[in-house]
Each structure stands twice: as structure tokens, then as C-alpha cells.
């Protein structure tokens, strides 16, 4: 389909702008990698790029098979290959998720929370409720994580809103229930992030495309101010649907007949990723879904992430009780 024909009928300004920008960016790069996850956002990215690419353009669609993937996702990857006539290159983790969890710790609540708690644990932090200056004297090489723990980031810092106070009662919970196991976000790094860097280096790409959206929220979306970033020492970064809101997604899907995996259409999941990831705020619902549709994966998730699930449940129960106390005081 000619690009002019693609954009001719587009009435949504966000979608129109994404086509124009994607065409400009793709045309001005020579070797491109595009991350494909089998999720809804990456489905749109793949469709969009296929609509703007010129014949012969070197584009590598890459899928990071973490080892904890729904069969529905694996099937969908094959469906995408057949639909668009492309090859989606599969890449395995540098370290498996079970090995990463065993070596570094389980993920808890969010990537950023896990990273901060991992840093504190690495310095044998005692989960103390002391002022920042006092703690910094005791743990002088852990400044950033201590700022998180003490809610000490400046309001001008882009991560201020993600200090520990962002998760209500989390500090109080940890003080009352210090973790007795290691916490880490390393499984994400070894299953996806570091793999992506390795692949891009080996392919010698000059552009990397990912399907992140600002509307997703969280620190990942908040840190991006533009859909395109150039780099002199590695590859440029492009986020084709960064500005898509949920209604833009739906409009695109309907306009261009974008089909999603059974994870959405049959299982009823809100989003996909590593199966049973403890970062999912609806992990209980997902566990029920896994047990129903892919029971072998359910057993694996319990064995790998069980400590994180239990700790999160305790935190949610603690939160509920603290909120009830606060409500009584206010009534």
C-alpha cells in the first residue's frame, strides 16, 4: 500500500502524526531493529512500520523469548509472521528467569522499587527509620537508594514522584515486615534489556524501535519527553506510538484490522509480558487465568515468584488496614 494512500483517509491527528514521523524516521535510517512482544502495543507498531517501510529496507523484528511466555503469545508471533510476510527473530535470555531470581532476587511491586530495594540490600541496610543525613553517614555509598527510602529527591527531579512515598504505606510496611529474601529487577535485565543491547550491537543497527506509550504511566513512560532520540555513540531510539492514548489504540485497531493474541481475546488479560510477573498489579487475576488456560506455567510461576506474591499480598493487606484506620480517624 502506497504511503499516500495510507494517510489519505486518516482523520485522527495522533495517528496521522505517527505515520508521518515513522515514515521520516524509517526512511533516514539504514538498519533498524523493532521489538516485538506479541502484546497489543507491539502489534500496532509492527502494522504501522510495515505500512511506511520501503521495499528492501533492512528491518529486523526481534522477539525476546524470556522462557516465561504464554503459548498464546508464541502462536501469535507465528500469526504475525504469516500475516505480514516477515521474519520475527527469536532471542533467548542471557540468564534464565529462574536463574536470575535465584542469584539476584525476586521482582517486587515495580522495576524501580525492586532496583532501590536491591541497592539497599547490597549495602546490608537494616530498614531503619532515620533521617537521610543520618543514614547517609552509615551507608555512604548508597545515596540514590537512600533518597528513595527517605523521600528526599528534589521536586525538580523527574523521579520525585516515584520515591517510596509514591506507594502509600510501603515504607511503614517494610519497617514492620522487613524482607527476609533478596529483591531485584535483574530478571528483566537478563531476559530483555541486556539481550536487546547485545542484539543491536551484533546487527550494527542505527535505529531501535519500541512500543512504549506515555499513557501506560509509571516511571518508564514518564521519563520520555519525545518519541525520537538521536545518539552519536550507539543507535537512535524511536517510540512510534509514544503519544497514543487508549482511544487512539482502539481507533487504529478498528481502522486497520489489527488482531491481537488469545491472551486478550480469549484469556481476557489487560496486558501481556512475562507470565505471572509480580509487577502486574492484577497478578492475582492473571494467576487465575494462567491456572485455567496454561496450568503448566502456573506451577512454574509459583515456584519462581512465590515469595514475591506472598510479600505483595501482605503489603496489600497492610495497606487495607492502615487505610481503614485513617478513615476512622477522619470520620
Where do the language-model regions lie?
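ATP/NTP-dependent adenylation/nucleotidyl-transfer catalytic domains that generate, transfer
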Residues: 2, 234, 246-331
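ATP-dependent adenylation/nucleotidyltransferase module used to activate substrates
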Residues: 2-248, 253-255
